[in-house]
Amino acid sequence: MSVAPHIPVMMSEVLHALEPRSGALYIDGTFGAGGYSRGILSAADCKLIGIDRDPAVQPTATQLVQASGGRFAFAEAPFSAMGEVLASRGIDQVDGIVLDIGVSSMQIDQAERGFSFMRKGPLDMRMAASGPTAADAVNRLKEAELADIFYVYGEERRSRRIAKFICTARAEAKIETTDRLAEIVTRATGGKHSKIHPATKVFQALRIFVNDELGELARALEASERLLAPLGRLVVVTFHSLEDRMVKTFLRSRAGLAGGGGSRYEPAVEAGPAPSFSLLTRRAVSASDEEAAENPRARSAKLRAAIRNEAPAWSDSPSLHTSIVPLARLEAAL
C-alpha cells in the first residue's frame, strides 16, 4: 500500500541547535525515514550513525549507507543502547545526538503495525520485532493495571471505566484488532467525539507501555550524557507532555538549575553534582505556524537542546522514570 511521506519535524530548528560541522561524528538515535540523517549529512562533511529498533527502516538505511560514501552507518537497536552500538565500533564519544521521540507517521500509516484506531489491523503497536503486543496487554493485564496505564501514560480521566469495559469484553472474546478496541473504548466513553477520537489517549497509553517509551527515553538521556564529548550537543524533539517533562527535568538538573521550576504541579529539581550541561533552550521551542499548518504532526512538537561541558557524567542520580506496571511482568506471563 502507498503511505504518506514522512516529513521530519522542525528540521531547520534541529540543524540550528545541532550546528553540524565538518569532521564531526553524530548520532541520529531515531532514524525512521532518515529525514534528520539526510539533513545532517547535507549540512556538513561529517559522519553519522543512525540507530532504530524498527526493522522496517532497514531498506531506507541501506540506501543511505550506499549513497553516503562511507559517511553513514546504521545499527538496528533501541536508542537507549547507543553506548553499546558505539562500543562495538570502538567509539567512546560523539559530537552530537539527535532524538525524535514517539511513533512515526510511517508506523501509523501501516495498518498491519496496529498503531492507529483509524485503520483496521492487528492490535500490535510494537516498534521492534519482538516483545509483548498491545493485544497481550489488553487481554492479560489486570483491570487496575490497565486503568493505571491509561491514566498515567494517556492522561485519560475515564481510565477505570474504560478498563472495566475492556475486561468485560475480553471475557467474551479476545481483543485482537484495532477497530474492536476502538469500538469498546467508544462505548465506554459514551461515544462522544470531542476534538479528538475517544480512543486516542488509550492507544497512546498502550503504545507507550508496550514499547517502554519513557524508560527508553530516560536511559537514552543518561547515555547521551556519558557519550557526548565536551561541547557536544544534545537535541531532543518530543510530542507528548510526559516526554517533554522528562527531558526538561533531566536538562535542568544537569545544568545545575536546582530548585528552579518548582510549582504545585512540578516539583523543584534537586541539587546534584557539578553541572554537566549548559542549556541552549531556556524554554521549549515549538514549530512555526507555517510548519504546523503544513504538517499536523508538528503542532505538538517541542524541541529542547543543551551543550555538554567537561564535568563528569552524574554517576548517582534519581531515576527519571519508574514504570507503573513493569513490562517484564507481562513478558513473564506470555
From Swiss-Prot:
Catalytic activity: cytidine(1402) in 16S rRNA + S-adenosyl-L-methionine = N(4)-methylcytidine(1402) in 16S rRNA + S-adenosyl-L-homocysteine + H(+)
Residues that hold S-adenosyl-L-methionine according to the record: G34, G35, Y36, D52, A87, D100, Q107
Pfam families: Methyltransf_5
Subcellular location as annotated: Cytoplasm
PANTHER family membership: 12S RRNA N4-METHYLCYTIDINE METHYLTRANSFERASE, S-ADENOSYL-METHYLTRANSFERASE MRAW
EC number annotated for this UniProt entry: 2.1.1.199
Entry-linked SUPFAM superfamilies: Putative methyltransferase TM0872, insert domain, S-adenosyl-L-methionine-dependent methyltransferases
Function: Specifically methylates the N4 position of cytidine in position 1402 (C1402) of 16S rRNA.
Keywords tagged on the record: Cytoplasm, Methyltransferase, rRNA processing, S-adenosyl-L-methionine, Transferase
Gene: rsmH
TM region positions: none
Organism: Maricaulis maris (strain MCS10)
Superkingdom in the source lineage: Bacteria
Protein name listed in UniProt: Ribosomal RNA small subunit methyltransferase H
Gene Ontology biological process terms, A to Z: rRNA base methylation
InterPro entries: RsmH (IPR002903), SAM-dep_MeTrfase_MraW_recog (IPR023397), SAM-dependent_MTases_sf (IPR029063)
Keyword rRNA processing part of the UniProt annotation: yes
Disulfide bridge partners, by residue number: none
Coiled coil segments of this chain: none
GO CC annotation, single: cytoplasm
Predominant subcellular localization, coarse grouping: cytoplasm
Gene Ontology terms, MF aspect: rRNA (cytosine-N4-)-methyltransferase activity
Family statement: Belongs to the methyltransferase superfamily. RsmH family.
Major enzyme class: transferase
